[in-house]
């Protein structure tokens, strides 16, 4: 009982409730649209595993990551996994992004995001008084660029964008000056234009265009977004009830 009281004394209840509500809403959505509930059952199992993993990971004091090599080792391990997937990974939906293990498929880009957050948090926390110096933004950007490039060449443009967003968000809250922020935004815009011109494939450009204007091609690239809009709108405020959505039951989604 003492351990339980100690554990929950520092528990972030808001974060736990938010994550629980998001998870439950996802399960309800999956249960309502799927005729085959095998995916729903698998998701429940993985959710239970995730909760157990969260509890175990939250027991040690996270501040040990601030001292010692743990943060950098996590970062280095993520890079090695990304290099490994480029050599022996299986191709799924056009991207060589997964390592097939005997009981599940590992996507190294996911733990790489967590490792990047940890190493950047350690870097910024040790230099919070010097963050106004642009060199720290460049060094943190180099940490990010290595993972970004390894993920981008898989090619997994979606995960690469999330990795960039992690870095940009952490730089933004670290106390960056407006002048440096404007410079970062400008460099980001130039990098995006360069990627658009020489690196992005046609289907990746199509996804970006569809995200910006999902209704421009209702029968093509924007089909799912259009049908989702109908599904949400047809339910109005109270919804149609679990299992009674027309777009899901008639297999428009």
Give names to the regions the model predicted.
Residues 1-19:
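N-terminal membrane topogenic signal
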């Amino acid at each position: 009982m003492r351990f339980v009281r100690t554990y929950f004394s520092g528990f972030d209840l808001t974060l736990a409730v938010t994550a629980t509500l998001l998870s439950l809403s996802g399960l309800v959505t999956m249960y309502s649209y799927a005729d085959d509930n095998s995916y729903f059952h698998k998701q429940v199992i993985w959710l239970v595993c995730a909760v157990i993993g969260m509890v175990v990971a939250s027991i040690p004091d996270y501040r040990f990551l601030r001292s010692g090599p743990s943060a950098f080792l996590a970062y280095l391990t993520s890079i090695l996994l990304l290099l490994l997937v480029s050599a022996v990974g299986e191709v799924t939906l056009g991207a060589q992004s997964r390592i097939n293990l005997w009981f599940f498929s590992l996507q190294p880009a996911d733990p790489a995001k967590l490792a990047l957050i940890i190493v950047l948090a350690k870097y910024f926390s040790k230099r919070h008084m010097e963050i106004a110096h642009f060199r720290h933004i460049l060094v943190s950007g180099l940490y990010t660029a290595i993972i970004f490039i390894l993920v981008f060449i898989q090619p997994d443009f979606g995960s690469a964008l999330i990795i960039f967003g992690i870095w940009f968000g952490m730089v933004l809250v670290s106390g960056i000056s407006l002048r440096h922020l404007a410079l970062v935004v400008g460099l980001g815009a130039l990098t995006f234009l360069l990627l658009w011109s020489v690196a992005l494939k046609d289907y990746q450009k199509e996804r970006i265009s569809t995200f910006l204007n999902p209704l421009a091609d209702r029968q093509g690239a924007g089909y799912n977004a259009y049908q989702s809009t109908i599904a949400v709108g047809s339910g109005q405020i109270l919804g149609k009830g679990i299992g009674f959505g027309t777009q899901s039951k008639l297999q428009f989604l």
